A protein has these predicted regions:
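Small-residue-biased structural context
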Residues: 3-155
Length: 155
C-alpha cells in the first residue's frame, strides 16, 4: 500500500557535461544545482513559505559569492569577455531578486522562476562558463596555483 509519501523528482540533474575542469567551480556549480533542487522539493512538498524563501535567500547569497569568485578568476586571467560575462551575472541576480520580491508579495513562487533557474544555470555553464574555463586552462600550470589560492579565500 502507498504511504502517501511523495518523492520529488529533481528539477535539475548534475551531468558530466557540466564539468569544466576547474574543480572548485565544478563543486560550486554542483552546490547551486543542489540548492535549486532543494527549492523545487520544498515547493513539491508544499513546505511553508518561510522554508522556501529561506532557501531562495541561501541561493542568492551563494550565487553572489560564486559569481564574485568567477569574476575574480576572470580578472586574474585577463579573460577578454569579462564584461559580457559579468553582465549575465548581473542580469541573473536582478531577475532572481525581482522574482523573489514578487513571490514574497503574492506568497507564491512561480514555476516560471524555477524553470528559469534550471535553464539559465545549465546554459550558462555549458556556454559562458565553458568559454572562460577553457581560456583559463590554456595556461593551466600558471593558473592552477592562482585558482587554488583564490578559492581558499572564498569558500
Amino acid at each position: 500500500s502507498r504511504t502517501g509519501i511523495c518523492m520529488a523528482i529533481a528539477l535539475m540533474a548534475w551531468e558530466e557535461k557540466f564539468c569544466l575542469g576547474l574543480d572548485e567551480i565544478d563543486e560550486q556549480h554542483k552546490s547551486l544545482v543542489d540548492l535549486i533542487n532543494q527549492i523545487w522539493e520544498s515547493i513539491i512538498k508544499k513546505s511553508d513559505n518561510s522554508v522556501i524563501f529561506a532557501l531562495i535567500g541561501e541561493l542568492e547569497k551563494y550565487t553572489l559569492a560564486h559569481f564574485a569568485a568567477e569574476e575574480t578568476l576572470m580578472r586574474m586571467t585577463d579573460y577578454p569577455a569579462f564584461d559580457k560575462h559579468k553582465k549575465e551575472h548581473q542580469d541573473f541576480v536582478a531577475r532572481v531578486s525581482e522574482e523573489k520580491a514578487q513571490a514574497e508579495a503574492t506568497g507564491q513562487l512561480s514555476l516560471d522562476m524555477m524553470y528559469f533557474l534550471r535553464n539559465w544555470l545549465g546554459e550558462h555553464i555549458l556556454i559562458s562558463d565553458k568559454h572562460y574555463a577553457d581560456y583559463s586552462l590554456r595556461n593551466k600550470k600558471e593558473n592552477r596555483s592562482l585558482i587554488s589560492r583564490l578559492f581558499r579565500r572564498f569558500f
